[in-house]
């Protein structure tokens, strides 16, 4: 897949897509960014960089691109900002941004009747009833507001926008800005009381939270993400409520309603995980396991600035491997991507995801840089050529590492740091392991008594998978070694300025001694890498349920295909 928020109207963009041939293109804006900004003079600036001004004109542009990409066999997923509103309810020139759209540009022939006359009633509220707002981005000199997802009128607005995008030929949506703030509106007060009533008995509310009469209790805060050091049991219930109710709204708008319009509508969320940040980050950190990704087609998790540079001398590979394995385990081998904000190490970003069940890649497929474009195309065509080993594959492991979600539920993040530490040790030792949540009974399995062994440097990561058709084990090797760009004056590692600074250093002489399933017979072994057009046959020895082989030299990504007798 590819995703772009800028320069997607460049003349080179569509030719690049035709070369790389991604299956999914995240293109276009159909939520609050579009409706807040398309009619303004800020239409072509951050965040959405809309190609033309005007709702009708810009909508027609997206519709034309949807039709074009469909003729090339690509699915188009639109970005859908669910609540972040840019505008001013009033100014010397009247309403601006979203509020101007709602008053003057809501076309009932296009969107149906307005859910409510006054848009201020749909906003998140402070304790005194005023709208929560900020002047953070300063887009067009306007403020930012947030709609309350729990407000039924706002859900009608989102549904109107969902329908309009479906009419324009979109294949699905990725919901972003999927937050809840410290909203104290009547809907949040009511729904949080209902949540507590279902979860706790009256006596428990008294003893645990000092709530004497829930029906009459008015909360002075209902927080969502917050500083873990300032967390309390009640605040974590507020966060859990926020995440559950957000998921319920997502399901209502995109799953139930969206798929009533288009039964195969692709539905995804854009979330944030950083370096496994919890309580202060991760939109699903307290979400119950049975709701985690339920009915969603793929996930986007942003690692932000946590994994877009290397400091090899300190063992920092700038990787998202551990995050990827956590997401894969929670999402049960369904597709996901990591938004690494990586514009330099393009090969590694693609390889890391491919090796761990992900869909390469997130942001910053730099199609205007000739070298980046060449590399992206080469690696995407490699994935297409060997589609059978990636599509619908499942992880193949010899051990599990438990992720301490139950500790997070208690507000104890010490075990998360221990998880990071242990995870890195296992990765450095090249142990084939999955990540499972400790909230799932029986999810863990003991490590094999004599596990597979890989003689490889610690700058290489190893994983394994089974293709959907079976009869094969695929071992993935990702090499992070490189010539690093100079650090800054303070000694901080540099993320680099583009693919010319990726500078990977090939790895040589990796040997392996791996376990194969009991009773299996190896028919042959092949080695593939994006830098070579054809597979290479590898010599091996097999005895007593184990296979030994050596890898040829490769640059960043290599896969060993161990083919088994059916």
Label the model's feature ranges:
Residues 1-7, 401:
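An acidic-aromatic substrate-binding cleft motif
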């Amino acid at each position: 897949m590819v995703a772009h928020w800028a320069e997607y109207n460049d003349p080179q963009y569509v030719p690049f897509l035709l070369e790389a041939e991604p299956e999914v293109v995240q293109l276009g804006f159909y939520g609050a960014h579009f409706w807040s900004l398309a009619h303004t003079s800020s239409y072509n600036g951050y965040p959405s960089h809309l190609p033309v001004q005007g709702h009708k004109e810009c909508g027609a542009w997206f519709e034309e691109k949807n039709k074009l990409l469909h003729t090339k066999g690509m699915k188009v997923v639109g970005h859908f900002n669910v609540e972040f509103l840019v505008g001013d309810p009033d100014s010397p020139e009247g309403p601006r941004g979203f509020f101007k759209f709602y008053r003057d540009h809501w076309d009932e022939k296009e969107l149906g009747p307005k859910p409510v006359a006054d848009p201020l009633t749909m906003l998140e509220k402070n304790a005194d009833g005023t709208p929560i707002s900020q002047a953070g981005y300063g887009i067009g000199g306007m403020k930012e507001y947030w709609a309350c997802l729990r407000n039924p009128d706002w859900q009608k607005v989102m549904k109107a926008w969902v329908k309009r995008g479906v009419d324009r030929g979109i294949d699905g949506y990725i919901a972003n800005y999927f937050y809840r703030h410290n909203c104290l509106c009547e809907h949040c007060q009511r729904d949080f009381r209902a949540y507590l009533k279902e979860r706790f008995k009256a006596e428990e509310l008294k003893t645990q939270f000092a709530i004497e009469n829930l029906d009459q209790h008015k909360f002075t805060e209902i927080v969502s993400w917050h500083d873990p050091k300032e967390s309390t049991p009640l605040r974590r219930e507020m966060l859990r409520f926020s995440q559950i109710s957000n998921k319920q709204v997502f399901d209502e708008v995109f799953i139930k309603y969206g798929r009533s319009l288009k039964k195969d509508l692709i539905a995804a969320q854009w979330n944030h995980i950083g370096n496994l940040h919890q309580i202060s980050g991760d939109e699903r950190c307290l979400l119950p396991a049975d709701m985690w990704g339920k009915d969603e087609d793929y996930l986007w998790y942003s690692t932000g600035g946590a994994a877009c540079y290397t400091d090899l001398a300190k063992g920092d590979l700038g990787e998202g491997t551990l995050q990827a394995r956590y997401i894969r385990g929670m999402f049960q081998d369904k597709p996901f991507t990591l938004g690494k904000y990586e514009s330099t190490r393009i090969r590694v970003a693609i390889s890391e995801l491919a090796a761990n069940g992900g869909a390469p890649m997130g942001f910053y497929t730099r199609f205007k840089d000739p070298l980046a474009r060449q590399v992206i195309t080469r690696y995407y065509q490699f994935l297409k050529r060997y589609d059978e080993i990636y599509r619908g594959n499942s992880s193949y492991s010899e051990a599990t590492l438990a992720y301490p979600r139950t500790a997070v539920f208690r507000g104890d993040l010490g075990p998360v740091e221990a998880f990071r530490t242990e995870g890195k040790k296992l990765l450095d030792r090249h142990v084939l392991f999955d990540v499972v949540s400790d909230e799932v009974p029986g999810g863990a399995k003991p490590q094999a008594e004599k596990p597979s062994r890989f003689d490889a440097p610690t700058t290489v990561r190893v994983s394994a998978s089974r293709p959907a058709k079976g009869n094969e084990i695929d071992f993935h090797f990702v090499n992070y070694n490189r010539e690093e760009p100079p650090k800054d004056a303070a000694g901080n590692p540099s993320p680099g300025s583009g693919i010319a600074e990726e500078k990977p250093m090939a790895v040589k002489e990796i040997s392996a001694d791996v376990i194969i399933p009991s009773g299996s017979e190896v028919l042959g072994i092949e080695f593939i890498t994006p830098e070579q057009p054809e597979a290479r046959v590898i010599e091996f020895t097999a005895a007593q349920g184990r296979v030994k082989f050596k890898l040829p030299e490769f640059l960043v990504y290599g896969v060993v295909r161990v083919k088994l007798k059916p």
